[in-house]
C-alpha cells in the first residue's frame, strides 16, 4: 500500500494535508485508472504559480474500513477536480480570440451599422464632400465675378470714348441758331481748324393765334443741301463783287433778292404741325380769355 499527499502553497498551514489511501493489487481497476491518469496529466500541465508537492510513504498491511475509504476518496477527488478546473480557466484566459477580417464576415455587426449611420442617416465623410463641393463652387463664383469685372471695365471705357465730344468742343456760351463749332482736320501734316455752324438745337417753334398754341417742328436738312447752299452763296458773292464794280446802285436790289431766296430755303426746311384744338373757335368761345395779356411759357 502507498499514500499520496497533495499540498498547495496557497493553503493555510493550520489545516492538515489531505491524504489519499489506495490499495494496490495485481489486477488494474478501470474505474480508478482513467481518472488518475487524467488528474495526474492536469497536474503536470498546471502553471508554476500553483506547485504541488507529492509525498509517498509506506502504508501498514492492515486494510482500512470501506466506509472510511469512500469518504477519503470523495474528498480527494473533489480537490483534484478543483485543481483541474482552475488550470482550464487559466488556459481560457491565455487563449485570445483570433482576428477575423471584415471581408470574411458576411453579415454586418451592430458597431459597423452604427458607424454607417452615425451622422443622422448620412454616411461618414459626406460632410467633407459637401464642404469640398461648396469650396469649389465659391471659387468658381469668385472667378466669374473677376471675369465680369474685367469685361465690364473695357465696356465702360468704350462707352466713355463713344460719348466723348469732338475736340475742341462746341462753344456752349453762345445760344441761338448761329452757334459756332470748331472742327479740326489734317492737311499735309498740318492741323487745320475750321469754324462751322452746327444744326439748330431748338427743334420747335411756338406760335399763338386765335387762343391756341401752335408748334412748328424743324426738320434738319441733309448735308448735301448744306453744301449746295454754301456753293450757291459763294457763287452769288462772286457775282455781287463783279456787279459792285460795274454798278454800285444795283447792290440793294440784289440783297433783297438774296434775302427772299434765304427765306424760301428756310420755309422748305420747316413744316408746321398743328395740334388738335381744345378751345372752341367762333362765336361760342369764351371771349373773357381774349382780354388776358399774353404769357410766355418755357418748357424743357
UniProtKB/Swiss-Prot annotation:
> Can you tell which superkingdom this protein's organism belongs to?
Eukaryota
UniProt lists compositionally biased (Polar residues) regions at 30-56
Question: Low complexity bias located where?
Answer: 58-88, 142-151
Tissue specificity as recorded in UniProt = Expressed in the shoot apex and young siliques. Detected in provascular and vascular tissue, but not in the vegetative meristem. In inflorescences, restricted to the base of the flower and to the vasculature of the stem and the pedicels, but absent from young flowers. Detected in the center of the inflorescence meristem.
TM spans (from-to): none
Q: Any idea where the FAF domain is?
A: 166-217
A Pfam match is FAF
InterPro entries per UniProt = FAF (IPR021410), FAF_dom (IPR046431)
- In this chain, composition skew of type Acidic residues spans 233-262
BP term (GO), one:
regulation of meristem growth
- Annotated region Disordered: the residues are 30-104, 142-170, 227-264
What does the record give as the function of this protein? Answer: Regulates the size of the shoot meristem by modulating the CLV3-WUS feedback loop. Can repress WUS but is under negative control by CLV3.
Recorded family membership: Belongs to the fantastic four family.
Know the name of this protein?
A: Protein FANTASTIC FOUR 4
Q: To which species is this protein native?
A: Arabidopsis thaliana
Amino acid at each position: 500500500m502507498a499514500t499520496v499527499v497533495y499540498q498547495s502553497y496557497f493553503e493555510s498551514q493550520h489545516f492538515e494535508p489531505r491524504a489519499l489511501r489506495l490499495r494496490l493489487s495485481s489486477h488494474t481497476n478501470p474505474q480508478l485508472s482513467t481518472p488518475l491518469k487524467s488528474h495526474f496529466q492536469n497536474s503536470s500541465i498546471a502553471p508554476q504559480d500553483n506547485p504541488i508537492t507529492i509525498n509517498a510513504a509506506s502504508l501498514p498491511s492492515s486494510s482500512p474500513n470501506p466506509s472510511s475509504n469512500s469518504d477519503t476518496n470523495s474528498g480527494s477527488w473533489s480537490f483534484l477536480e478543483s485543481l483541474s478546473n482552475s488550470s482550464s480557466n487559466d488556459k481560457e484566459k491565455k487563449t485570445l480570440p483570433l482576428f477575423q477580417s471584415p471581408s470574411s464576415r458576411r453579415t454586418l455587426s451592430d458597431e459597423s451599422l452604427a458607424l454607417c449611420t452615425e451622422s443622422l442617416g448620412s454616411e461618414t465623410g459626406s460632410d467633407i464632400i459637401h464642404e469640398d463641393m461648396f469650396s469649389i463652387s465659391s471659387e468658381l463664383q469668385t472667378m466669374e465675378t473677376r471675369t465680369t469685372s474685367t469685361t465690364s471695365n473695357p465696356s465702360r471705357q468704350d462707352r466713355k470714348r463713344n460719348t466723348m465730344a469732338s475736340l475742341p468742343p462746341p462753344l456752349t456760351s453762345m445760344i441761338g441758331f448761329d452757334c459756332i463749332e470748331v472742327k479740326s482736320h489734317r492737311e499735309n501734316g498740318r492741323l487745320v481748324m475750321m469754324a462751322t455752324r452746327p444744326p439748330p438745337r431748338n427743334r420747335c417753334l411756338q406760335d399763338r393765334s386765335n387762343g391756341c398754341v401752335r408748334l412748328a417742328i424743324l426738320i434738319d436738312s441733309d448735308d448735301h443741301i448744306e453744301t449746295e447752299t454754301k456753293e450757291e452763296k459763294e457763287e452769288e458773292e462772286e457775282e455781287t463783287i463783279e456787279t459792285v464794280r460795274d454798278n454800285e446802285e444795283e447792290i440793294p436790289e440784289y440783297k433783297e433778292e438774296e434775302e427772299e431766296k434765304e427765306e424760301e430755303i428756310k420755309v422748305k426746311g420747316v413744316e408746321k404741325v398743328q395740334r388738335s384744338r381744345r378751345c372752341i373757335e367762333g362765336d361760342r368761345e369764351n371771349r373773357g380769355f381774349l382780354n388776358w395779356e399774353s404769357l410766355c411759357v418755357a418748357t424743357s
